[in-house]
């Protein structure tokens, strides 16, 4: 998988997390509001991807997926504190669960599909 495609999927996962969270708390649906909530997490995603050099193997769970997940949550929450946006303990738990499921999940699906294709080819 190309690094740019993986990055787009990761960004979509983070935007989905933010959009669902904003909708569940009845915040406005403005682009500005979405951007205001998303920037700490998108910055964290970028940090996690750079630290793990995810462009080398962007679709693997370790290190790329793990770096994306933990970077998004850890750096994102830290930046939310610095920006005065708040980080309730329950919010951290929800972020860990949702982003873990999505940022690691799509990579698990890609890995499973690759194993299935390899097994199918070896049976021919």
Language-model segment annotations:
Residues 5-9, 100-124:
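Membrane-water interface at the C-terminal end of transmembrane alpha helices
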Residues 33-42, 91-101:
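Alpha-helical transmembrane segments of polytopic membrane proteins
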Residues 13-25, 43, 47-55, 75-79, ...:
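Alpha-helical membrane-inserting segments
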Residues 52-71, 89-96:
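Internal alpha-helical transmembrane segments of multi-pass membrane proteins
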Residues 28-47, 63-66:
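Loop-to-helix transition at the N-terminal end of transmembrane alpha-helices
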Residues 78-94:
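Membrane-helix boundary connector in multi-pass membrane proteins
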